[in-house]
Amino acid sequence: LTTVRHLMHAGDEMPLVPSDTPMAGALLVMSQKGFGVVGVTDAGGRLTGIVTDGDLRRHMDGLLSHVVSEVMTHNPLTVAPDALAQSALATMNARKITCLFVVPPDGDGRPDGILQIHDCLRAGVA
């Protein structure tokens, strides 16, 4: 059985920005990393939010005049690194989302990685 840890992207692959990042910078990271989302972290590196394409659409007017903390969805859904990939895939399907940040349940809230629905599908998780 495959766990999230085996499929997740970690380190520099993670699309993360501090909460005071201007939206132009967040869009750049979102494009460079290729996940279609960007995670938002506080000064301690803890995941506090996520910016998705839906957030971008909701804030189209004057988008670039904002910082990420004004646009983000707070308290994003996450998955534990030891969770089964099949469970993560089921969550993504049920919630109609394509990515989950991987955060250890007993940690300090800092993300270990990000899992994309395509990672599960490529690995044959169904």
Give the predicted meaning of each segment:
Residues 7, 30, 45, 71, ...:
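Terminal peptide-recognition signature
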Residues 34-64, 68-75, 81-90:
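Helical hairpin unit composed of two closely spaced alpha helices linked by a short loop
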Residues 2-14, 64-76:
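Bateman (tandem CBS) regulatory domains
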Residues 2, 9-12, 25, 32-35, ...:
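Short gly/pro-enriched beta-turn/loop segments at secondary-structure junctions
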Residues 16-34, 60, 78-106, 118-126:
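The conserved cystathionine-beta-synthase
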Residues 48-52, 98, 112-120:
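Short hydrophobic beta-strand motif reused across regulatory alpha/beta modules
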